Amino acid sequence: MTEPPMRIALLIALLLSSLSAYSEPLAPFAAEFRIYVNKLPTPVKADLVLEPAGKPDYYHMLLKAKSFLLTNKEESYFYWNDCQPRTDRYVHEFDGFGQHRYHHMQFQWDPPRVHNESEDDAASMDIADDTLDELTILLRGRCVFATGDKEYTVTSAYGDDLRTHHFVVIDREKIDTPLGKVDTLVVENRRTGDSKKKRRTLFWVAPDLDYMVVKAKHIESTFLKAEMIMIDYHGPTLEERAAAAEDQAKKTRPGAE
């Protein structure tokens, strides 16, 4: 029988291999989603893309929803180090219904500060050193959930506002995706100070896909619910990701060369 000290050593090794896998470079992907409102399909589709951006540990993440009536685009350029995204710049643009609204945000970190330009204003504000943007806040969950923790809190900067988000795992669910049936964690984004008690935002994140969002749901009220469901995916398959994780685990096992 394995002695307790050896058990502890093995558990530490397994934990370190798990953390190491999620501090590795991010795997690029492109996914397409269909938007449903009150369970009815709409003509709106959304693209979610993660790709390297030309410098070491530097990435571009894009979420773009488009139909013949509107275009809504969010994108973030950020560095990824030690399981932590650090935003360089963030853009949110909306075109539709005769309106054009936008936020162009430039982050600096010495000292931590963000400058925002919008359609009618420009302002700067100090931020905490761990502040994220609205698009990359879920990436932080990769490493938190990989350790077995069920919740985390982050602050995001948006426009001239700072927002606190509390993400909590509330369930597990197997769902159908373009890659087949996958196991997911159901994560709720609990906003601090939200005046609408019935408003909820849920994300289904897949551990076997590096905690990628494969489904999202926003409940505005009893009568208005919207869902974003993945309908296409291009990137590492479940088998390729499992093989890469196993290879990484072998490298971090005690006695590995």
Walk through the language-model features, giving the residues of each.
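Intrinsically disordered, low-complexity regulatory regions of eukaryotic regulatory proteins
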Residues: M1, Y22-S23
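Positively charged n-region of N-terminal signal peptides that target proteins for export
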Residues: M1-A9
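Hydrophobic helical h-region of N-terminal Sec-dependent signal peptides
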Residues: L10-L16
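N-terminal signal peptide c-region/cleavage motif recognized by signal peptidases
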Residues: S18-S20
